[in-house]
């Protein structure tokens, strides 16, 4: 299933990426 494959591929790495993103956003807010 193409959609499931794509979601899996995006979601797999993006779990770690999500935490990185949050970390980056928090850092960005604090640096202002």
Curated annotation (Swiss-Prot):
The protein here is known as Fibrinolytic enzyme
Which biological processes are named by the entry's GO terms?
A: proteolysis
pH dependency: Optimum pH is 9.0. Activity is stable from pH 6 to 11 but decreases sharply below pH 6.
What's the EC number here?
3.4.21.-
Q: Which UniProt keywords apply?
A: Fibrinogenolytic toxin, Fibrinolytic toxin, Hemostasis impairing toxin, Hydrolase, Protease, Serine protease, Toxin
**Which organism's genome codes for this protein?**
Hediste japonica (Polychaete worm)
Q: What does this protein do?
A: Plasmin-like serine protease. Has fibrinolytic and fibrinogenolytic but not plasminogenolytic activity. Cleaves after Arg and Lys residues.
Describe the thermal dependence of activity: Optimum temperature is 60 degrees Celsius. Activity is stable from 40 to 80 degrees Celsius.
Instruction: List the molecular function annotations (GO) for this entry.
Output: serine-type peptidase activity; toxin activity
Activity regulation, short description:
Inhibited by phenylmethanesulfonyl fluoride (PMSF). Not inhibited by EDTA, EGTA, beta-mercaptoethanol, indoacetamide, benzamidine, aprotinin, pepstatin A and trypsin inhibitor.
Would you say which domain of life the source belongs to? Eukaryota
Q: What is the lineage of its organism?
A: Eukaryota, Metazoa, Spiralia, Lophotrochozoa, Annelida
EC class, as a word, reads: hydrolase
Modified after translation how? The N-terminus is blocked.
């Amino acid at each position: 299933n193409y959609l499931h494959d794509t979601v899996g591929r995006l979601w797999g790495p993006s779990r770690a990426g999500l935490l990185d993103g949050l970390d980056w956003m928090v850092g960005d807010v604090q640096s202002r």
